[in-house]
């Protein structure tokens, strides 16, 4: 463990452990796994991002600056793909944009993407937009122009095409436990008494019957978006890993 990482961990360790164990009273082992994973992601973080981290440690409210001018966009609508967006950075700079918020760009199934919010793979860019290498190159160029990069990180649910969902459908209990599965409608009916509907017209109800596994699964958005079960510490840890992987590509802000 480096001195820098140890200093940061010690500063937040007690609060982090307390909060984690409040969520997961029997999760000491999972907490240790989380800490080990965070250290590994720190080790893999490149020197440029580490230098930026140090700078921002000294200016903790950097993201609140009145000098930040943001722009939110869908990559394909603005520039076709990530490479095209990179070519338009000079134009954005001329407009004084220094905070670039990218709408969802991760891999989603065709026809069931919900505008990019039905993620099938958190470590793969939608092929029509480019590759993860393209994203890393874009972030490098953004930072060369003092432009911060933000992304939408969809953490409430995954696509039914996600590996976890596929393995859950195949009957693997470990993966069913990462979602909300029910053998009958008894418990879902209780949820429905108080749980509001996100899309009452286009996708009414919060549960979907899956004939392929003879179970109900919680789907508060669309039937192809399965809610993640954060009562399971494995879900929390794995999603943190996904987030830190993306942050190490040069993402500054996660929404």
Map each language-model feature to its residues.
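Acidic/aromatic-lined carbohydrate-recognition and catalytic surfaces
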Residues: 1-232, 236-240, 244, 248
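Receiver (REC) domain switch/active-site residues of two-component response regulators
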Residues: 252
């Amino acid at each position: 463990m480096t001195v820098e990482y140890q200093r940061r961990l010690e500063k937040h360790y007690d609060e982090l452990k307390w909060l984690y164990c409040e969520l997961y009273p029997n999760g000491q082992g999972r907490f240790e796994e989380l800490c080990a994973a965070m250290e590994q992601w720190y080790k893999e973080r490149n020197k440029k991002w580490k230098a930026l981290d140090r700078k921002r440690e000294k200016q903790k409210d950097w993201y609140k600056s009145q000098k930040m001018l943001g722009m939110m966009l869908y990559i394909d609508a603005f520039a076709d793909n990530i490479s095209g967006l990179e070519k338009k950075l000079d134009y954005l700079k001329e407009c004084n944009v220094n905070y670039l918020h990218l709408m969802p760009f991760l891999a989603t199934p065709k026809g069931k993407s919900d505008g990019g919010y039905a993620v099938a793979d958190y470590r793969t860019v939608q092929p029509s937009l480019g590759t993860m290498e393209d994203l890393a190159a874009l972030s490098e160029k953004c930072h060369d122009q003092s432009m911060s990069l933000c992304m939408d990180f969809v953490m409430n649910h995954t696509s039914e095409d996600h590996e976890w969902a596929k393995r859950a459908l195949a009957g693997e209990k470990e993966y069913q436990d990462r979602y909300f599965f029910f053998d009958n409608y008894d418990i879902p009916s209780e949820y429905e008494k108080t749980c509001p509907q996100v899309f009452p017209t286009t996708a009414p109800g919060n549960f979907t019957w899956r004939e392929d596994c003879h179970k109900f699964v919680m789907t508060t958005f669309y039937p192809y978006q399965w809610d993640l079960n954060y009562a399971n510490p494995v879900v929390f840890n794995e999603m943190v890993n996904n987030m830190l992987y993306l942050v190490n590509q040069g993402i500054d802000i996660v929404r």
